[in-house]
Amino acid sequence: MKRFLLACILITLASPSWATKIPSGSKYDSRIQYVDYNSGDVVLVRALPGVGARIVFAPGENIEDVASGFTQGWEFKASHNILYLKARSMTLSHSNQSIDMAPEPGKWDTNLMVTTDQRMYDFDLRLMPGRNNQRVAYRVQFRYPAAAAAAAVAAAQKRVVQARMNARPSPVNWNYTMQVGTNSASIAPTLAYDDGRFTYLRFPNNRDFPAAFLVAEDKSESIVNSHIDPSAPDILVLHRVAKQMVLRLGNKVIGIYNESFNPDGVPARDGTTVPGVKRVIKSPGENLQ
């Protein structure tokens, strides 16, 4: 007896497990149904004779291929991310006679396989009896909790990176002096510092920003790219750290001198001087994560 029970248990454990995923009905109407996507699930779709149904996939997803084990008895029409389906009559030829067969519950059940440009789906199609059967589906709509969670994580990471990029950097050098040219005090900055990568100049409110020029050892000048700090519109950010720069606006001129100039600047160990942000170079076509 014990051997028999053990054999039954082993057979049960070795048997395949079939568990069709049944969509849940809307609280407003049970015929509007929802199901979470899982690539390992087979989803049950219950239909009625003479009544169409539709399966709705993710927005932006496009159906590429539809296959079924009983295409003679079912009609399928794909439109972007929606698949319309309906059981249909079929005609059989026997002894030179044509016999029309209407869809019949229990005999029209089959499987359905859908391939989109993003995922693969498997279904059991079941034709149900009774016109008022509340278990049938007019619409089966997929939800994607894993994709939504991944998108939320990616969005949160993007916000963190953007916040770090927008954050005001920590100054590493305040040791700046300046020489004010004749009648040039109106374009003189009130504050100067650098973070080892960029130079930051603060100006009184409502003043025009001067153009900045890098002064080379041979005293030649070249323009320096700059932008206004979005979090502090009175600060002009120069995209260089240099020993000497010149500010010009019309005939006005200011000399800016970095008295603690470090030609090596701040080492960018992660490809960027922004704390917590790492620069990653990927090959063409490689997805960014």
Curated annotation (Swiss-Prot):
UniProt xrefs under Gene3D superfamilies: 2.60.40.2500
Assigned keywords, A-Z: Signal, Virulence
Source domain of life: Bacteria
Pfam families to which the protein is assigned, alphabetical: CagX
CDD domains associated with the record: VirB9_CagX_TrbG
Signal peptide: 1-19
UniProt induction comment: Specifically induced within macrophages by phagosome acidification. Induced at 37 degrees Celsius in minimal medium, suggesting that nutritional stress is a regulating signal.
InterPro entries: Conjugal_tfr_TrbG/VirB9/CagX (IPR010258), VirB9 (IPR014148), VirB9/CagX/TrbG_C (IPR033645), VirB9/CagX/TrbG_C_sf (IPR038161)
Disulfide bonds: none
Job of this protein: The VirB system could be required for the establishment of the replication niche in the host.
Family stated for the protein in its record: Belongs to the TrbG/VirB9 family.
Misc: Transcription of the operon is maximal in early exponential phase.
Protein name: Type IV secretion system protein virB9
